[in-house]
């Protein structure tokens, strides 16, 4: 089984997302973060779960409320590294 790691930008994205949610929907903040991390952990066994975005990047959509979040990740022989986490409506 592969390990799942948050890259530096993904860690910053998650912190920013949590801060934003705590200011607007405190009750949703922990649920959203828990769901994102839970879906990320599924990549340890199913690294091809997301769609291919480019030759070395995949995206996994995490449904939450009316929209959701997108996890961009790279798959390596022993690890899955989450590169970015963003809201599905966020500009790229």
UniProtKB/Swiss-Prot annotation:
Keyword entries, A-Z: Toxin-antitoxin system
KO phenotype (gene knockout): No visible phenotype when deleted singly or as the relBE3 operon.
One record GO biological process: SOS response
Matches recorded under InterPro entries: RelE/ParE_toxin (IPR007712), RelE/ParE_toxin_dom_sf (IPR035093), TA_system_RelE-like_toxin (IPR051803)
PANTHER family: TOXIN MODULE OF TOXIN-ANTITOXIN SYSTEM RELE_STBE FAMILY, TOXIN PARE1-RELATED
Its biological purpose: Toxic component of a type II toxin-antitoxin (TA) system. Its toxic effect is neutralized by coexpression with cognate antitoxin RelB3 but no other ParD or RelB antitoxin.
Sequence similarity: Belongs to the RelE toxin family.
Protein name: Toxin RelE3
Origin organism lineage: Bacteria, Pseudomonadati, Pseudomonadota, Alphaproteobacteria, Caulobacterales
